[in-house]
Design a protein with these regions (language model features):
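Alpha-solenoid helical repeat scaffolds
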Residues: 19-20, 33, 67, 113, ...
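TPR/TPR-like (Sel1-like) alpha-helical repeat modules
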Residues: 2-10, 39-46, 52-57, 132-137, ...
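"A position-specific structural signal for the A-helix of alpha-solenoid helical repeats
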Residues: 34, 75, 110, 114, ...
Length: 284
């Protein structure tokens, strides 16, 4: 995925250094989102940050469109969520600030969703609730504008955030019910060509929630199901490995940890999860 999008990115890289961007650059922005996604799955966090910093340096566009708005929202969101840096996610802000975000509620919703997940995971429930209110407002705008697909996406985003708010409030049954509903809704929808994948799959989040509730066998089933729809995801594979290990399924754990090592063979960052995988495989 990374190499397939590199040519498009390099072809327009010179334009990315300008303070105003023409329409030809949007192919590069689109490619950059795919590249950041791919880098983060392979634990090439430094490469991902280089691209994210290039995006962050852009302050003005002379032509605005959805592809650009989506990239501006998705790339910083991916960087935070794919590193499970919930504090960073909770601090996400729309940028460039003078982009007409009101024209692109479906793009703004990506960042608001990511920020609200960060808030819910860090226990700042009030901030998460405020963002849920914003998501409802954005969903209404999409519905009015006949953006049915994106309104549906925002609907399951709302459910997912409400699930993590419920978990923070120790309403565990409600949390699992809402998270499962979000996962089912997401999987009933198609992937839009603008994106390599949602910023975080709801089924993957369900697996992590079940792990937090000490239900590793159930979590393993959800991670494995998530990997069918969203294969080769760092957190999906690590989650499956960790769930298998915790549920006493050593063979499956070994297989998943080995897959994780293969996926990240060209990594530029030694994440703690990779150290755990190496330690597990060394002991077995």
């Amino acid at each position: 995925m990374v190499e397939a999008n590199r040519a498009s990115y390099l072809a327009a890289k010179a334009e990315l250094k300008k303070t105003t961007l023409g329409t030809g650059t949007y192919d590069a922005l689109h490619a950059m989102d795919y590249m950041v996604f791919g880098y983060l799955q392979q634990a090439q966090d430094k490469e991902a940050k280089i691209l994210a910093d290039e995006i962050a340096a852009i302050q003005k566009l002379n032509v605005e469109n959805f592809v650009a708005a989506y990239s501006f929202a998705a790339i910083p969101s991916r960087l935070a969520l794919e590193q499970r840096d919930w504090k960073k996610a909770a601090e996400l802000k729309l940028s460039p600030s003078d982009l007409a975000w009101d024209k692109f509620p479906q793009a703004e919703a990506i960042l608001v969703f990511s920020r609200s997940l960060g808030a819910a995971h860090t226990g700042t429930v009030q901030a998460a609730r405020k963002d849920v209110e914003r998501l409802h407002t954005l969903k209404d705008k999409m519905t009015t504008a006949k953006m049915g697909y994106w309104a549906g996406q925002t609907d399951f985003q709302i459910k997912a955030v409400e699930a993590w708010i419920a978990l923070a409030e120790k309403r565990n049954d409600d949390a699992v019910r809402l998270m499962r509903a979000a996962a089912e809704s997401e999987e009933a929808s198609d992937k839009h060509p603008v994106t390599p994948g949602n910023v975080v799959p709801c089924r993957e989040l369900l697996g992590e929630m079940l792990m937090a509730l000490n239900q590793p066998a159930q979590a393993l089933a959800e991670f494995e199901r998530s990997l069918i729809r969203d294969p080769n995801r760092f957190w999906g594979i690590f989650g499956a490995a960790r769930a298998a290990e915790a549920s006493g399924n050593g063979r499956a754990a070994r297989d998943y940890y080995a897959k994780l090592q293969t996926l990240t063979a060209d990594r530029d960052t030694e994440r703690p999860e990779l150290a755990h995988a190496k330690a597990f495989l060394t002991m077995r």
